[in-house]
Design a protein with these regions (language model features):
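Residue-level recognition of tetratricopeptide repeat
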Residues: 32, 65, 103-104, 137
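Alpha-helical adaptor scaffolds
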Residues: 80-113, 120
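Structural motif corresponding to the intra-repeat A-B loop/turn of tetratricopeptide repeats
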Residues: 3, 37, 70-72, 108-109, ...
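Structural marker of alpha-solenoid helical repeat scaffolds
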Residues: 19, 52-53, 85, 89, ...
Length: 154
């Protein structure tokens, strides 16, 4: 997304946050946009609050990704929390969480094989363009891992 669109998104999510401060998705999306705009400290503060107060693992996942990108070892803690919660949610409600869990394992969770399994499950549940795009990204991530393994054995 270009900077102008990110600025507009930040304004919109901040307005939503001010109107309904307890609405976690507005806070989470605002943090995501802030991180993209380089407002890392604000994004981290917002996500830390959400990650400890919400049972939605997306916030811990976003927090882990931003901390990892910043080179902070705390990312492991948040990544572990998100991983455990996604595993629980996929076990009990696969149709609702397979896509989000696959996104996590492609990103902060760094397990493309698990992402591929979940992306395949997601395509079986919902045959949408978004589901197929997620599957394609998971396949590509596994091909990259496979190529690295092959190269290391040369």
């Amino acid at each position: 997304m270009n900077k102008g669109r990110l600025d507009n998104a930040r304004i919109s999510f901040d307005a939503a946050r001010r109107r309904v401060p307890a609405y976690a998705p507005a806070q989470g999306h605002l943090a995501e946009v802030e991180a993209e705009l380089g407002q890392t400290e604000s994004a981290l503060a917002r996500l830390r609050l959400l990650a400890v107060s919400s049972d939605d693992p997306d916030y811990a996942s976003q927090l882990a990704r931003i901390l990892r990108d910043a080179g902070c070892s705390q990312f492991r803690h948040w990544c572990g929390l998100a991983a455990a919660r996604y595993d629980d949610l996929v076990a009990s409600h696969p149709e609702a969480f397979a896509d989000h869990a696959a996104e996590f394992w492609l990103g902060a969770g760094a397990n493309p094989d698990k992402a591929l399994q979940l992306a395949r499950m997601n395509v079986e549940i919902r045959k949408t363009s978004r589901a197929y795009d997620l599957l394609a990204r998971a396949v590509a991530a596994n091909e990259v891992v496979g190529a690295k393994v092959m190269k290391s054995h040369e």
